[in-house]
């Protein structure tokens, strides 16, 4: 009887995990889209961007990055999400294999151009504007734009989630990077050593804001991703922290 109950519990947990993955895009099958590229052969033009990550090399994202069209960007909530992409249905320009990229920027619409002739990022199109180096791993440079298939995949990161504290007193702006698992953060809370947990508001990209006075307190952070999973990093910033510093917390597993 005990083994039977444990077996049923295991099946239930497996089904729940499968349901969560399906709801948030994992194992949901391949979706058709298009891809172009930008940023130059060294991807220098991809630095910065609407997600606020700044230097993508120093942040660990490198050149495996993409700017997302309006339909995918979700007003910045998709920043940090990972996608597997492969070129399809174009034997003249496609290369074999697939790439995995992180969403780091926004590809704005160009309503002056038709959706199929320059307005690739116009709603409701699903479009990836890739860094040039990663584009050339699935298609030839001369192609310019190619049909692709994509799917959401978990993000694999080295080390823990990183929290960079910017701003000033009463305006704490925390950039959250290097997030594994779902990758796209939908909620952040902060707790000082003399305060309770306080929900932060998303300022832009993956910059999260708190208007409370947190100076002189050890800081803990609670991060919730789009799949509903939460990870808590306790007291990762000492009471002596200062603006401009980066601290590493726990990671999604």
Swiss-Prot record:
Where is the Expansin-like CBD domain positioned along the sequence?
170-249
Q: How does it sit in the membrane?
A: Peripheral membrane protein
Signal peptide boundaries: 1-25
Q: Which SMART domains match?
A: DPBB_1 (SM00837)
**Annotated GO biological process:** plant-type cell wall loosening; syncytium formation
Q: CDD domains of this UniProt entry?
A: DPBB_EXPA_N
Q: Which GO terms describe its cellular component?
A: extracellular region; membrane
Work out whether the entry's keyword set contains Signal: yes
Report the sequence similarity comment from the record: Belongs to the expansin family. Expansin A subfamily.
Q: What task does this protein carry out?
A: Causes loosening and extension of plant cell walls by disrupting non-covalent bonding between cellulose microfibrils and matrix glucans. No enzymatic activity has been found.
Entry protein name: Expansin-A15
- Organism of derivation: Arabidopsis thaliana
Which classification does the entry list for the species? Eukaryota, Viridiplantae, Streptophyta, Embryophyta, Tracheophyta
Query: Gene encoding this chain?
Result: EXPA15
